[in-house]
Amino acid sequence: MLGDTMASWTGGIDFLRFCVIALNSVSPETSCRILIQPESIRKSLIALAKNGVKTLLGRRTMPLAGLPRNELIYALKSSGARIDVIDYQDTASDLADAMRRCNADVLFPCRISLGNSFPLPWVGYIPDLQHKRMPHWFSEAERRKRDDMFSKILDEAPAVVVNAAAVVQDIEEFYPNHKARLFALPFCPPAHLKKFSESYGLEVRAAYHLPARYFMVSNQFWIHKSHETAFMALRRVRDSGHDVHLVCTGKTLDYRWPEHFNDLKGIIEKNNLQEYIHILGLIPKRDQLTIMHESLAVIQPTLFEGGPGGGSVYDAISINTPSIVSDLPVNREIDIGVVRFFAAGSVDDLAAKMVDMLVTPPEMPSKEETYARLTLRQQEFGKFLLGILSMVAKGEFA
């Protein structure tokens, strides 16, 4: 597995973790090798300079690592699978050499094209086509960059994996002449019988100064996540007489819209919600899941996703927590778990669904029942992904 480009955002790390868990469920004897560049300031600066020279010369470059590699490695090893970490330098040739050193059959997922001349099998990955569906959220330069990157993947990869059937439909619409075979992964939150300690739950709640009753939004503060919809819905719910709060986790920076988080804070202040909205930022995964487990429900107000529900809904279903999710076509692909939908962008409809959740809590399946269903789904996911990787490794799509 190629770790560099997936480590640049928490959703990418979660995606790799889900894939490793699924593959391990059907082929536990198989070792997953994570290829990633060494984390070193000196080497990163040298690699950055090399990439600049290569760009001027028109030569292919490899992406630099995003988040610290330890975060990625820890997340993958927590899956329970056997993980081997393989270092490589910043060139495609060294990447190929690293694959040979560890006897890798195929490389996945590749968010940039390795080209037709790359000597070993590889599988492309496209998270979404947000720049096509929501172009106003991107600069012209970034739209061109994404177009070029995705066009190359779709022309040069033998197969490309996406997270939803909706993304396949988008690719067929915007890149109708693509050459790659497209595969939409089945919706599959990870199966685990995680036990939440009541004492640790109280400890976490005290540490973060959380109230007894709250909904949760667990997204990075990107503009398309539409936190403002949840904020205004909370205002309506409180005005209707319900004493409930909202807890938010996730990074607070949107690089495309640096002022977005300040705009959201302005909405909170304007509507006198400072006391009722708790923004915790990016917190340890264990704490995030504990807070999620203690919540009334996870709210997913997003206006765009590349996978059903986004990562927070995967986690919510996995730990048997209900969700209230915007009714985007991609989110309608959620076919497991306790989920209620609301009209995307509608403050009134979300508020109504929140009140309904307060007044009539859903009947939840047992944790054991959820685990059993997710285990079967996880094995289906693992077999499906393993089949794709095996076919590419054998050159069946060449």
Where are these regions (language model features)?
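Carbohydrate transferase catalytic cores enriched for Leloir-type hexosyltransferases
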Residues: 1-398
